[in-house]
Design a protein with these regions (language model features):
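Detector for outer-membrane/organellar transmembrane beta-barrel domains
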Residues: 153-217, 312, 344-347, 359, ...
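Hydrophobic, lipid-facing positions within transmembrane beta-strands of outer-membrane proteins
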Residues: 60-62, 83-85, 116-120, 160-164, ...
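Short beta-strands and strand-coil junctions in structured, solvent-facing domains, enriched
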Residues: 143-144, 172, 222, 358, ...
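Transmembrane beta-barrel domains of Gram-negative outer membranes and organellar outer membranes
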Residues: 39-162, 170-171, 175, 204-210, ...
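Cleavable N-terminal export/targeting peptides
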Residues: 1-43, 254-266
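Transmembrane beta-barrel strands of outer-membrane/channel proteins
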Residues: 66-68, 99-101, 134-140, 179-185, ...
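Gram-negative and organellar
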Residues: 254-303, 308-361, 365-402, 407-411, ...
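Flexible, glycine-rich linker and terminal segments associated
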Residues: 41-43, 232-236, 240-277, 390, ...
Length: 461
């Protein structure tokens, strides 16, 4: 046999890197387990490599991770390599929601910031013996200041798409082959995602954690491989258009369900005094010169039950680290409140609280609640009068209690999926009125929720 050494070119070097990457993943399979994993890896949602599929994660699955994205696969606004990170939750067996941030340079400063987007997937048809599963989904559908997803104007929506996709799996001798076919709905002319897409995945019977995939994403052909590591981690890499390599890593967790417990706790009189240590981590993406404003605090608190229905909380906030300016640099008061519960006719009850609250407010608050005997329905009224409570330049500064706020709320409890549905009409601190809807689900020791609100002519979610 004769072997001729090829000329070393940039293209050959890219192919060499691709082969080395895939080989590394192959070697790492000695530490994987047998649990399966599915996701549209590049966007942090369920699917193949760069296309969605109609597969869904197990109910309650939480995923978080990050991806390396070469400039060849990014929209035209990116002229450089970038990446994204995401959180994803299978909120219901047929519903998946993801929040994603893609790193983006600000043209005016050259500093890194991020583009934020949301993905939503709904499965109207689950896979059966003779038919495929079907999913209808969207990526980056809405944008700031524009609620009409069909308009080209307003916002960025770099990754916008609406699609319908079907997936069918075929098994033989323990092997699994998945076939996916779908198409993008042409809902706006400036969308980067158009046309038909499809792909094939293969899981060998002798190595279930390994998945090999090939796809056409409506523009180019991609080939890649993924592997499940240590029960909770997934690593993947793929060749985009046979020109460059993309890849990523994510963590997955499926918590156990738990039974409901009342969210309105009636405080007994037992004289208990507790010292509780609260870690505080805050991330805020509101600046063009940094990716996040970050705050890390330790906030110890004394919590005491005084007499029947009465409670006291005294908290101090100790700053650990932050990249902000203002009161975040100072040791300051946290929650300092005294509350008293009282019973009302018909099984209703109330609570009045006075003191220093969160969100830099100080004042008085009154809550009235009534729950049906089976705890399925809860009705509530709330009102308060507050002023500002801030700590600048080493001084605690408070204002007069002039701001009036309030709310009327109703909650319905759905027991099959351990869910609460809340509807509230609110008057906010600065006098604006709004409506808010919350959908909350309880997983194990974790509670997750989705909300939508409308106030002042603007909507948020």
């Amino acid at each position: 046999y004769f072997w001729i050494k090829p000329k070393v070119t940039e293209q050959n070097m890219k192919h060499k890197i691709i082969k080395q990457t895939l080989l590394t993943i192959g070697i790492s399979l000695s530490i994987v387990n047998s649990q399966l994993s599915i996701a549209q890896r590049s966007l942090g949602v369920s699917g193949l490599l760069n296309i969605p599929s109609a597969d869904m994660q197990e109910d309650g699955t939480f995923m978080t991770g990050g991806n390396y994205l070469p400039q060849e696969m990014l929209p035209r606004e990116w002229g450089y390599n970038s990446g994204n990170y995401f959180v994803n939750l299978t909120f219901l067996p047929f519903m998946e929601v993801a929040y994603r941030c893609t790193l983006l340079k600000v043209k005016s400063t050259g500093k890194w910031n991020q583009d934020r987007s949301v993905s939503l997937r709904l499965r109207p048809l689950k896979e059966g013996k003779w038919w495929p599963s079907v999913v209808i989904g969207s990526n980056d559908l809405l944008t700031t200041g524009e609620l009409n997803p069909f308009l080209d104007s307003g916002g960025n929506r770099y990754f916008s798409s609406v699609y319908a996709v079907g997936t069918k799996h075929f098994g033989f001798y323990g092997h699994d082959i998945g076939v996916t076919v779908g198409g993008h709905v042409p809902f706006r002319s400036r969308s980067e995602n158009k046309g038909v897409f499809g792909g094939v995945s293969y899981r060998p019977a002798f190595l279930k954690p390994l998945e090999v995939m090939a796809e056409y994403d409506s523009k180019v052909v991609n080939v890649g491989v993924s592997a499940r590591l240590f029960d909770h981690f997934s690593l993947y890499a793929y060749c985009y258009d046979f020109k460059t390599v993309a890849g990523g890593l994510r963590y997955e967790l499926t918590p156990r369900p738990r039974a409901f417990r009342s969210d309105e706790v009636r405080m007994p009189w037992d004289g208990r005094v507790e010292l509780v240590l609260y870690p505080q981590i805050t991330l805020n993406n509101s600046w063009l010169d940094k990716i996040y404003g970050a705050v890390i605090n330790i906030a110890p608190a004394v919590e005491a039950r005084l007499w029947k229905g009465a409670a006291f909380t005294g908290q101090v906030i100790l700053p650990v680290w932050n990249n902000m300016v203002g009161q975040m640099d100072y040791i300051r008061a946290g929650v300092l409140t005294l509350s008293q519960e009282f019973g009302l006719p018909g099984g209703a009850f109330g609570r009045v609280t006075v003191g220093n609250f969160t969100n830099s407010r100080m004042g008085a608050d009154l809550k009235l609640r009534y729950a049906t005997p089976d705890d399925r329905w809860l009705f509530g009224l709330e009102g308060g009068v507050t002023g500002s409570s801030t700590f600048y330049e080493g001084k605690w500064q408070v204002s007069n209690w002039k701001r009036v706020s309030g709310a009327a709320e109703v909650r319905f409890r759905e027991r099959r999926f351990n869910m609460d549905f809340n509807l509230g009409v609110h008057r906010y601190v600065y006098g604006d009125y709004g409506v808010r809807v919350d959908c909350i689900r309880h997983f194990g020791r974790t509670t997750a929720g989705l909300y939508a609100m409308y106030t002042g002519g603007e909507a948020n979610s």
